[in-house]
Amino acid sequence: MKRQLLKGITPKGFKKRFNKDEDCYKYLSELKWADESFVCKRCGHTHYCKGHLPYARRCTRCKHDESPLAGTVFEKIKFSLLTAFQLIFDFCIIERRASTITLSSKYDIRQKTIWEFKHKVQQSIGCMNVEMLDNNVYLGKFIIEDNRKRHATNNIVVALEISGNGGVGRAYAEIIDCTSDKATKEFLERHCHPSTTIFISKEKENDILINGWSDVQFFANNEAVEMLNEHIAELKNWLCGNHRNCSHEHIQGYLNEYYFRFNLRKQKSIMFSTLVSHMANTSPKRTKSKS
């Protein structure tokens, strides 16, 4: 079975492609077992026959039936697979308007249930392979208050890729522990190619980067710095506007969400298929209820 990624899918095309649960099970099975990659989770056998459940596969040795949902982020969802696909599609295309309140009303599902699924999606995005930044990278930091804890703040570091012709490339952000001198350096190591030139401000806390990175320079291009500041302002407005009551432990999930869309902003047609494909091949994580 050849893996199929949907390209250029529109809301109308989505409804035509996914009209019932069976359509979703079929697509998920194609992604999960791409190129006939079935391996029984119980005994490791690689031969199968048709299972009892829709598009399930039954191991010919131990007779274990495995659903397309098993071992994926979709495992144990509290609504239909079609609804899950619809939520993910909304998540990819609606952006700012995809609040849990709006989606709860649209699909007649409890807001908490919607939030828990969205949190699973955010966690899944956080497990995606990082495409390392390899152009000039401008480093910025900002602080937002934690509305749930008095006098508490959240420290966020941003790395924005700016090409030689002044175009904005990809970017990443993480919530960090400001008390750790190594936090920013470790963030860059996770997201930037070792040969990348890092541009930083002349702040004391950036001293560790000067000695720990191959090519570090101070801000010089005012236009690039302005682009960085505009990027941070947009991110901050999104966090403080849409998710101003988000607790510290969940901010990274929203950063994952923001940068998944940002980094695919020129490839919006593949957002849905990219995300579903990843979720089909990612083990589920336990999520905490929103406090």
Put a short name on every predicted segment.
Residues 1-291:
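Residue-level recognition of single "structural anchor" positions
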